[in-house]
Amino acid sequence: MIYTTTDTIPGKEIAEVRGVVTGNVVQSKHIGRDLMAGLKSIVGGEIRGYTEMMTEARDIAIQRMVEQANQKGADAIVGIRFTTSSIVDGSSEILAFGTAVKLVE
């Protein structure tokens, strides 16, 4: 499966649009990470625990989006975008979305 943030794939031609595909995950914070985040916010610096959590969540969202594209018989996903939002206090959602397409063979 090819997936890209661009609207085209160099060297490939889109034969058919299979529709919008999405993948999302809601990730909650861990109390230990919250304590470290509080300390980091005082002294400054990257909060590695949250960075790792969001990277993992993004990977899961992409995986779910790719699974949906496979179910639609797509060869690729173009125009991928990501959004994040706070769902409830202590949790965040990452949504990945794009257009599933069939490529000319």
UniProtKB/Swiss-Prot annotation:
Family the UniProt entry places it in:
Belongs to the UPF0145 family.
Q: What is this protein called?
A: UPF0145 protein VP1283
User: Source species, please?
Assistant: Vibrio parahaemolyticus serotype O3:K6 (strain RIMD 2210633)
